[in-house]
Each structure stands twice: as structure tokens, then as C-alpha cells.
Amino acid sequence: MIAGFANIFRIPELKRRILFSLGLLIVYRIGVQVPVPGVDSAALASIFAAAKGTLLGLVDMFSGGALERLSVFALGIMPYISSSIILQLLTAVVPHLEQLKKEGEQGRKKITQYTRYGTVVLSIIQGFGIAVGLETMTAPGGAAVVLHPGWSFRLLTVITLTAGTAFIMWLGEQITERGIGNGISLIIFSGIVCRMPVAIGQTFQLLSTGEIGIFLVITLLVLMVAVVGVIIFVEQGQRRIPVQYAKRVVGRRMYGGQSTHLPLKINSSGVIPPIFASSIIMFPATIASFINIPWVQAISDAIRPGQWFYELLFVGFIFFFCYFYTAVTFNPTDVADNMKKAGGFIPGIRPGRRTAEYIDKVLSRITLGGACYVSAICVLPSILISHFNVPFYFGGTALLIVVGVAIDTISQIESHMLTRHYEGFLKGGAGRVRGRS
């Protein structure tokens, strides 16, 4: 494994991609420290300290601590994710967008452009809501959060937060295209990982004050290790459908006749469902947290992590996005047609429509299992943790994102190394981390 890491620096392109990604992630973390003008940071920090364990704390986790400081990156990448969700949903019902999706690279660029426009619009709406809400907020000590309220502050805040989100979106796209891994996922990953030392410090502080016992801390560590183990095991799990290729004679040579398989991942949607589900819930909740209206606050309290309504809503969105994302990224009809053209068939299943129906049936069952797995990982640890006042960063959602993104990034690095005939991180084919099929 050590030799595998050493091989990274022997491949110039891979080394350049990794350093490029790390450099942009450092730029992102620097931007998290730059506050929006006109805000009392101490007053805002005291409000977030009082909001620990609420949905506002979960939103702050996904922003990497930027919301707590109200930095220029306070909105994080969530407006971009929300815009992506809206565009993907519209693609299924709007003929023009569906046609663009089928046009290949040019169509994809056009949809990406629409996603960027949507990101800016959502950022303006969310930024304005936060600006107005901040003007009504006061710290527990009575200090006002906004030093000079008014339209100048609102306009400056909207412009700053929108520009910050647009810059994060650009960073993510650059990492995906010129770096290693998925840029958007890595930005969320870095935000969670960078906040974990703070969460560990908070846990030890609770331990020192006697609010939690040593037995609970040990139980928490065991639970975390078990959850990480389950995530690694399931994320690499596959259902392999056997495929046979008929023999064909071309000239004097015989082709085909070999046996292979069609790999279907148990969780083919990866970390997308919990990220999308969190984004949907957080968008209205973020604005609600900054608006001091009783009925709005009641809604915000109802969708607080650990509450049954929040967990039920979260699971519902996870199931929806597991099936929706799988349907968007994997088309059984196309797979069956390509298999038929290449002379392949599933033993006992007729090529063509019957093969597509069989693959769709298997995929639906696997997706159900994957959705149950993602829901259990995200919800069950969070329910237990919320009852013991432990930071969110040890919850299932954070662990699934961290481990899932790490596996995906390692898979890409491993693929680069094996393509250039270098040994991967783990010796032996069975031990290697397999990439998503």
C-alpha cells in the first residue's frame, strides 16, 4: 500500500491533478474564513452556539462552518445542487430539455449553462432571505447581529453571497474537469472533514463537564467504526448478471464465445441521495432559521434533526432520489440494445425487450435494497446521536458522504495508476477498490 502511494508521484499527470485539486480546496477553505461586511461575528457565533443540534447546525456542517461565520461562502454549494435537482426533474417532463440530453456533449453543456443560471437565481433568493432575517436577529446577550441594517446591507449581502456560491460552483467544475474526483462532492467532503476536529473537541468538552460519560464515548466510537465498515462493504457490493457472447466467424477468425457479466452496484447512486435530500430540506429551512416569525419558526422546529417528521421526510427524499438518479444514469433498454448488437445475451432470457425488462426488474430490487441501506445509515445513527447531544459530524449522513467520496476518489486514482501499469493501493485484484460501473 505504501508503494502504491509512492507510485502516485511517479505519474506526472496524476500528480498534477491531485495537487490541482488540493490547491483549489485550500482556496475554498481560505474563502470560508472571509466574512460578509457589516455583521457582528461574535453575536452571530453566540446564536449558532445556542442553535447546536438544530437544522441550522446541520446546514452549517454542509457549508464547512461558513454559515456560522457568515463568510462569502455561507450559502455553500447547496444552491447549485438544488438547481441541478430542478433541471434533472424538468428534463423528464420538458421535451426541449429531454432533447438536449440526447444531443451529447453540446446538449450537456447547454443543460450545465441552465444549471448555472438557476444557481444564481436561487442564491439571490436565499441570500436576500438571510439578509432580511439577520437584521431581525439579536444575540442571547442582546447585541444586534447586523451593525448597519438597511437596503445597502441587503444588497451587499446578496451580491457577496451570490458571488461566493458562483465561485464555489466554478471551483467544483474545475476540480472535476482538471483535477481528481468529483469537485462538488469533494467540496462538501472537505467542509465536513475540516469541521470534525471541532466536533471532537466539543465531545471531549462534554465529557470533561460530565454531560456525557466515557461509556457513551466508547459506544459512539464503536458505532462509527461499524457504520464505516458497513459503508465500505456495501459501496463495493455488486450484483453480477451473467452475459454470454455468441461465436461469430469473420473471415478466417472466430470472435466471441466468451462469458462475462453485467455489474450492478447495490448503491449505484452513491452519496447523491443524501446530499440531494439534505439540499431540498435545507433550502427553506435555512431561510426559516433567519426569519423571526412564530409560524415559520414552528416549521423550522418541526424539521429539526432527530424529530420524527424530519427523519420521515429525509427517508422519503432518499428513496425518491435513489430511484430517480438510477433511472437518469442507467437505461436498461439502451444496455439491452447494445448487448444485442454485440451478440450478447443473458442465459435463459431472450435478447431485446425481455432482456431490458429483466435488467430493469433486477435493478429495481437492488435499488430498493440500496435505498434502505442509505436510509438506515443516514437516519439510525443520527436518531441515537440526537438523543445524547453529540455533534452532527458523527452522524450517518456525514460518515456516508466522507467515506463514499473517499472511495470514489481513491477509485479514480487507482484507475489512473493501473492504466499506466503501476500497482494500485491494494495488491491483488480482489482487494482493489472497484470503481463504479
Which residues are covered by each model-predicted region?
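N-terminal cationic and glycine-rich segments that engage phosphates or anionic surfaces
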Residues: 1-101, 106-437
